[in-house]
UniProtKB/Swiss-Prot annotation:
It comes from Drosophila grimshawi (Hawaiian fruit fly). GO terms for biological process: chorion-containing eggshell formation. It is found in: Secreted. Keywords: Secreted, Signal. GO terms for cellular component: egg chorion; extracellular region. Its main location: secreted. This is Chorion protein S18.
Length: 166
């Protein structure tokens, strides 16, 4: 629907273009050229424009005296004589920014809901050190990232990487 409306407006603009005020070099025939006007995206890019004073801090902060930089909206098309948009170097970044703006929300983060696991622990069996309790009762088993960290630390202790007993 939006594309249809935009094409409709462009067609009307092309048909109703007049020769009034179009004096000078490089004149275009009546109705020969129509520009598609789109609202600027909310993404902006900091573009260095040369000169002295300014920098990224606006003359007050970091980069004073190293040239001016302006914040411009990201446009779909950049031409050397236009003052709108960014250089073609940022074309990939522009595509990614448009995709991120147009992408639907993914919702909340994916969470793996595991049931709580209670393990009965007895005092029998090999003991790894005096720091570990005898283990009568029940403990809750680690889940997710905690389980990975716990298993890696246990693997390290089994391979002889544990600290001295102090």
């Amino acid at each position: 629907m939006m594309k249809f409306m935009c094409l409709f407006v462009c067609a009307i603009a092309a048909v109703s273009a007049s020769d009034y005020g179009n004096v000078g070099y490089g004149r275009v025939p009546v109705g020969g050229l129509a520009y598609q006007v789109q609202p600027a995206l909310t993404v902006s890019s900091i573009v260095p424009v040369g000169g002295y004073g300014g920098g990224y801090g606006g003359g007050r902060g970091y980069g004073r005296g190293y040239g001016r930089s302006v914040e411009v909206p990201v446009a779909a098309v950049w031409t050397p004589n236009s003052r709108y948009g960014v250089a073609p170097v940022d074309r990939q970044a522009l595509g990614l920014a448009k995709l991120s703006l147009a992408a639907p929300g993914a919702g909340g983060p994916l969470v793996l809901n595991e049931p709580r696991r209670i393990i009965k622990v007895s005092g029998y069996g090999p003991q790894r050190g005096y720091k570990q309790p005898l283990g009568y009762g029940s403990i809750e088993q680690a889940q997710g990232a905690s389980a990975a960290a716990a298993s890696s630390s246990v693997a390290g202790q089994n391979k002889g990487y544990q600290n001295g007993g102090y």
